[in-house]
Amino acid sequence: MLPRALYGDVSWQDALKSTLAAPSIKALSGGRTGDELFFVAAIVGAPGLWMEARESIRERDIVDAVEKSAVAFHAMFDTKIQYSISSEMSGETEILAVVCPIVSQEMSDSEQAFEAAAIDVQNAGKLLGLATAAAFGKWREDENVTLAKTRHVIVKSNREIPLFVDGERVNVGRTAEISFIPDAVNVMVPERIT
């Protein structure tokens, strides 16, 4: 997602060629939780465990994929996440997505905030409905999704919080703070993209 957002829908060879032909420096915002930086999204909650099963499938380790799928399915409705997005917006949910502006379809990449989505899927039927909406790009309109723009998120749980930043699992314990970083890193892009 990040390469496409930075360089467009081109091969890496074309992205490199156009960047070297007319280089420009772009400040890229991101997020931080603990010592971990991210530039695409942080996914908080047990449904993020499906990413580990997907990776096992990609590696063609079917036994591991089945085991990780079973863990993900069992934990999906057992792990509740308490969240605080602002003084006006807090609650409990199964999954919270914290999306950086550069990949959000609803925000300009120059916005100085995250797009946070609390996604409440209490049962498999609601999960299937949300997955169907997501397939058609309409997940933000689903009644089980609450959206907000924010620069800071706090999450808590009575269990170890499954938290993934840019697709990688990080250990955060039972509480985590996620903060927006306006100028997290400088990247080189083709001049026309800036």
Each language-model region and where it sits:
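Short low-complexity stretches enriched in small and charged residues
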Residues: 7, 52-55, 68-76, 106-113, ...
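A short, sequence-level motif marking secondary-structure junctions
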Residues: 42-47, 95-104, 169, 174-178, ...
